[in-house]
A protein has these predicted regions:
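Surface-exposed loop/interface segments of Gram-negative outer-membrane beta-barrel transport/assembly proteins
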Residues: 1-67, 107-114, 118, 122-211, ...
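Surface-exposed cleft-lining segments at the edges of enzyme active sites
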Residues: 70-72
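Short Gly/Pro-enriched turn/cap motifs at secondary-structure boundaries
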Residues: 74-78
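Outer-membrane beta-barrel channels and translocator barrels
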Residues: 80, 91-92, 126-130, 221-223
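Outer-membrane beta-barrel architecture
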Residues: 84-88, 99, 122, 215-217, ...
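A generic beta-sheet turn/junction motif
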Residues: 89-93, 102
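Transmembrane beta-strand segments that form the barrel wall of outer-membrane beta-barrel proteins
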Residues: 100-106
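Conserved catalytic-core segments centered on acid/base and nucleophilic motifs
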Residues: 125, 217-222, 226, 230
Length: 311
C-alpha cells in the first residue's frame, strides 16, 4: 500500500502520465494500465479498461493490495540426490577398483538444474616381482541449465555497479521488482512484452561439460634400492555453452519492436544505416530468435620419468 501511495503521488506530479508511460521502453503497473485503455476488442466493442477515474482507481487498487512475493514464486525448496557405487576385486597378480556416481540437483529456481555422471577405474598389474603396471581412467559428464544472460553493458566507476541488457537473473529480479506487479501479466521492457516466468522458459543456457583422463605408470625395480618409473597421462576436456533465445522471448521481440514512429525512433535495438542520413531504423531480426554456441576444448599430454634410490 505504501508503494502504491508513492506511485500515486508521483502520478499526481506528472511522472506517470499517459504520454510518458504508454511508449516508455520500460513500464510497470501504470504503463500496463494505459495499454489496456488503448486496447480495443472488435468482438465486444470495448476497450481493455475504461478511460474513467473509477476504472483506473479500481485497477490501481488491485495492484495496491497484490503484494507479490517474488522470492516465494521464483525460488523453491528442492532435494538433490547423489548416488554412488564402488567395486573392487583382484588377486596377487592383479587388483581392480571401479566406482560410478550420479548427482541430480533440481536447483532452487527455474532453469537451474544440474546432472552429473562420474566414473573411475583403477587397475594394478604385478607383472613380475620387479615390474608393475598401474592404469587409471577417469570420466565425468555434467549437464546444467541456467537463465539466459548477456555480457555486462557497463560498470559504474564510482559505485562498482554492473549493468546488463536483458538481465533475467531471478535473484536480482526478485530483489528489485515491485510487489504491485501481477506475476501472470506482461509488462513492458525494451519496448516489448515481458514476464519473468515466460522469459525463463524462452531464454536459457545449456552447459555440457566432458572431462576424460587416462593415465598409465610403469615401475621397474632392477635392484632392491633402486626404482625406475615412467608415467604417461592424457587429459581431454570440452565445455559447450549454448544460449537459446526463442522468437517469443523479450530479447528477440525487442529487436523488432517498432509499433509506431516514436518507438521506432527510440528503440536502440533497431538498425539505422550510417551511410544514409535520412534512412529509418529497421529490424535486423524480422522473425526468429538467437542461437549462440560457444565451445572450449583442451587436450594435454604429460610424460614423466623418475628414478629413486632408497637404502
Amino acid at each position: 500500500q505504501e508503494q502504491m501511495g508513492i506511485f500515486k503521488e508521483m502520478q499526481n506530479n506528472g511522472f506517470f502520465s499517459f504520454v510518458s508511460s504508454y511508449r516508455a521502453s520500460n513500464s510497470g503497473v501504470f504503463g500496463n494500465m494505459y495499454h489496456l485503455m488503448n486496447q480495443y476488442d472488435p468482438a465486444t466493442g470495448k476497450f481493455g479498461l475504461d478511460n474513467t477515474t473509477e476504472a483506473m482507481n479500481a485497477y490501481l487498487q488491485q495492484a495496491e493490495y497484490r503484494n507479490t512475493d517474488w522470492f516465494d514464486l521464483l525460488f523453491n525448496n528442492s532435494i538433490s540426490m547423489n548416488h554412488s557405487i564402488s567395486m573392487s576385486s583382484g588377486t596377487e597378480k592383479a587388483q581392480y577398483y571401479a566406482s560410478f556416481s550420479f548427482m541430480d540437483d533440481p536447483g532452487w529456481y527455474k532453469k537451474s538444474n544440474v546432472k552429473r555422471y562420474t566414473s573411475n577405474i583403477n587397475a594394478l598389474y604385478n607383472i613380475s616381482k620387479k615390474v608393475s603396471l598401474n592404469m587409471i581412467g577417469n570420466a565425468a559428464y555434467r549437464k546444467q541449465q541456467a537463465p539466459g544472460t548477456t555480457n555486462s553493458s557497463g560498470i559504474n566507476g564510482v559505485t562498482g555497479d554492473v549493468s546488463r541488457n536483458f538481465d533475467i537473473n531471478p535473484y536480482s529480479y526478485a530483489l528489485n521488482s515491485s510487489r504491485t506487479l501481477d506475476p501472470n501479466a506482461e509488462y513492458q521492457r525494451n519496448y516489448a512484452p515481458f514476464n519473468i516466468f515466460h522469459e525463463l522458459d524462452n531464454n536459457y543456457l545449456n552447459f555440457d561439460v566432458v572431462d576424460i583422463k587416462l593415465q598409465a605408470e610403469l615401475k621397474y625395480k632392477p635392484i632392491r634400492t633402486v626404482e625406475l618409473s615412467v608415467l604417461g597421462a592424457y587429459k581431454f576436456s570440452t565445455t559447450t555453452q549454448v544460449q537459446t533465445i526463442t522468437e517469443n522471448s523479450n530479447q528477440a521481440l525487442a529487436f523488432r519492436a517498432m509499433d509506431d514512429a516514436t518507438i521506432r525512433d527510440n528503440n536502440s535495438w533497431l538498425y539505422k544505416d550510417p551511410d544514409s542520413a535520412n534512412s529509418l531504423p529497421i529490424t535486423v531480426l524480422p522473425s526468429g530468435g538467437f542461437y549462440q554456441e560457444t565451445k572450449y576444448k583442451m587436450n594435454s599430454w604429460d610424460f614423466r620419468a623418475t628414478a629413486s634410490y632408497n637404502d
